[in-house]
């Protein structure tokens, strides 16, 4: 699913910047605040899923930790397949895009 949409890299960049921008939310412009809110909403939606906490651990490992691991390595830590890990990551990016207003589920 990578780069299927023109906005895909933009959504990934929004997700990567989320922890830093969350701390300075009041000083951000309107668009940056919308970006932070989109990621926060996607996190909330993901947490409500049955396997949401595992999905959030995956997202944290992929985007927000300094120790970079391969998708296969992260999947092994979570006891899921690499394909499932890739699907969860893609679903999270789509969720952020939906919360931001760039994607509509059909």
Where are the regions that the model predicts?
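N-terminal interaction/assembly modules
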Residues: 1-49, 84, 100-106
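Residue-level detector of well-ordered alpha-helical segments, enriched
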Residues: 10, 54-58, 88
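Amphipathic alpha-helical core segments of compact helical bundles
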Residues: 44, 63-68, 93, 97
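Short amphipathic alpha helix immediately N-terminal
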Residues: 50-69
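DNA major-groove recognition helices of helix-turn-helix
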Residues: 85-99
């Amino acid at each position: 699913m990578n780069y299927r949409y023109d906005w895909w890299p933009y959504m990934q960049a929004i997700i990567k910047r989320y922890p830093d921008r969350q701390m300075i939310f009041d000083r951000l412009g309107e668009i940056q605040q919308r970006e932070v809110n989109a990621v926060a909403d996607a996190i909330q939606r993901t947490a409500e899923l049955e396997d949401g906490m595992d999905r959030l651990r995956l997202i944290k490992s992929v985007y927000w930790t300094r120790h970079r691991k391969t998708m296969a390595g992260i999947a092994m830590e979570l006891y899921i397949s690499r394909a499932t890990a890739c699907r969860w990551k893609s679903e999270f990016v789509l969720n952020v895009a939906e919360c931001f207003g760039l994607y509509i589920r059909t």
